[in-house]
Amino acid sequence: MIPVTELRYFADTQPAYRILKPWWDVFTDYISIVMLMIAVFGGTLQVTQDKMICLPCKWVTKDSCNDSFRGWAASSPEPTYPNSTVLPTPDTGPTGIKYDLDRHQYNYVDAVCYENRLHWFAKYFPYLVLLHTLIFLACSNFWFKFPRTSSKLEHFVSILLKCFDSPWTTRALSETVVEESDPKPAFSKMNGSMDKKSSTVSEDVEATVPMLQRTKSRIEQGIVDRSETGVLDKKEGEQAKALFEKVKKFRTHVEEGDIVYRLYMRQTIIKVIKFALIICYTVYYVHNIKFDVDCTVDIESLTGYRTYRCAHPLATLFKILASFYISLVIFYGLICMYTLWWMLRRSLKKYSFESIREESSYSDIPDVKNDFAFMLHLIDQYDPLYSKRFAVFLSEVSENKLRQLNLNNEWTLDKLRQRLTKNAQDKLELHLFMLSGIPDTVFDLVELEVLKLELIPDVTIPPSIAQLTGLKELWLYHTAAKIEAPALAFLRENLRALHIKFTDIKEIPLWIYSLKTLEELHLTGNLSAENNRYIVIDGLRELKRLKVLRLKSNLSKLPQVVTDVGVHLQKLSINNEGTKLIVLNSLKKMVNLTELELIRCDLERIPHSIFSLHNLQEIDLKDNNLKTIEEIISFQHLHRLTCLKLWYNHIAYIPIQIGNLTNLERLYLNRNKIEKIPTQLFYCRKLRYLDLSHNNLTFLPADIGLLQNLQNLAVTANRIEALPPELFQCRKLRALHLGNNVLQSLPSRVGELTNLTQIELRGNRLECLPVELGECPLLKRSGLVVEEDLFSTLPPEVKERLWRADKEQA
């Protein structure tokens, strides 16, 4: 007989996989072991015990053996003796029945009756139990054996266990306990900032990733102290870094598909179907396991008898085992149905770390999907602590804090130079994103002109910043930077531009008001009315050299501090994010303004206060709610106005007074509802750029030929059917945007535009292109924006010239 301990082999998987087994899989595995025991026990008994014991029947009625002669006599007044040639004698007392059969005949009868008359369910019951149990085990463990899933599971478990046991995770939890049990007292704010000023230079980064956020009072205190505990050694740090890389690659690989989820779902469905099948036929056939079996076989010529009464010795035990087996299958099936319900009820292909993000400092922990999410859901059924610890290695903030342990060694000068880029202003800039601090090697980049610090909490600018003699621009995006006195003295004399992006107004460092040489200030964040009191600070009024002020916020009116510094401003830009801006009379005080941008301020009319700003050269009223611009007549007093941007509004028509703006060089009226262009517009003879795209125009007036200085014309996405010949008198045209109209043809006079470098024709009803396009000497194939089949209508020599021009440029 097989030892019970050997049966565990069929149910046990690799020990490491136990964390992927929810409680229902554990239950079903143990139930399967019990089922195997039933099968082995029943099969062993069937092999070792007598299968059937049969005796001939002397009294037979209708092929049925009567229990006694009296029963036979009562049922048959004229008895017959079909099963024997011997006449029965009256029962005169208890006498035995003797048969003249030998042992071999009995064995033969037992075998024949067992094979032919015993019901198949009673005969094969142990083997059926064994077969069904093996199928259950195969379904439960197939995903651990199938190569496409087992490889992912093995890799996942390996990484998960390493992350769980990583010193980085352990020290992070220890740091959390320290922070909770030993908060800094509130009164140490002043002492900490004064007595430890020198220690804040090149502040050591925390060695651990705290699992809980610091208390609000600690953040408000702004204490910067040196962490002396929890520093990983180099080997542990490298191991943790390698884990981060493994997690990234594994996540990228596993999130591509959902084969693990689908296979687990299918094997669960198969088990439910199998359960229903077993219950249906087992309950139906279990009553066929009987102790007494009548056996009628045609072997009278061999034994002298035709009917036998047989006993099935294992019937009672098999019926008990069958009942127990049915109860186990029912329990097994209920667990499988619960598993299926769990999988259908929950979105298992998405896993959110929202709770961990809320209770920790890892607000950037990404949600995962597909097989990665499903495996994490299974892990949560085993122990949610695994996924919480694993989440540390999904956070970029956590990774950056780990790097900070050896920041100066990792961020070598050569590595930082590789991150240097040229911005749009052709300045050399370095962007540091989500680090734990500023590497000391940054201050060896003496050629650096722009330094961007984004999402760097609790950073302290050290005195060594004075080495960056070329630094003129600093960006602080969600970075409440502290600064030491020598560093502030350097920035006060050298910094020219400062960009600050914040969520809370308190993130704006107070030391910026000491930057007396500052010329540009960009503020992006919440500056609503209830927060205005925070920015009415006398220090900002000391920025006497401020020339450019950009505000991207949700103001209801201009803060007083803006008005105070506006006397010497040259450029003011307000992007109000769709909030209505009222009370603009204070603009009159900004007499030195040359550029004014009021973007997304929900303006319905052009503010009258603008008309008194006689130095204005550019006005941008993008994305407001302008429906009429009758006030444009007052722009004639702005003699220096060269650029007017009224785009992304709801303007229905252009007033004829626009012709008074004779100095206008650029006019943006795209994304409006204009249906007609007044002739007076073409009195603006200095126009070089005219954008009327995305309107409702149906034609271009012939007077457009008056714009002899026009270099760029855009009428994309209108309903223009034809181009006036006068358009091609604008010989200085370099770009002509005509896409998405209803043009039927392109005039051959297009060849007269000898300065044309770009023409857009896509989305029209053109059937062919004029050959005269080849007469535009500066036009290249890349500058001809048109459908490929339409381009093919050009003669080969024209196409060849356009292609050749592109190649020559390359």
Swiss-Prot record:
Membrane topology note: Multi-pass membrane protein
Entry keyword Cell membrane: yes
Cellular compartment(s): Cell membrane; Lysosome membrane
GO MF term set: cyclic-GMP-AMP transmembrane transporter activity; identical protein binding; volume-sensitive anion channel activity
Site (Required for anion selectivity): 103
Result for mutant: residue 103 to A: No effect on anion channel activity. Impairs channel selectivity, so that the channel is also permeable to Na(+) ions
Glycan-modified residues: 66, 83
Name the UniProt record assigns to this protein: Volume-regulated anion channel subunit LRRC8A
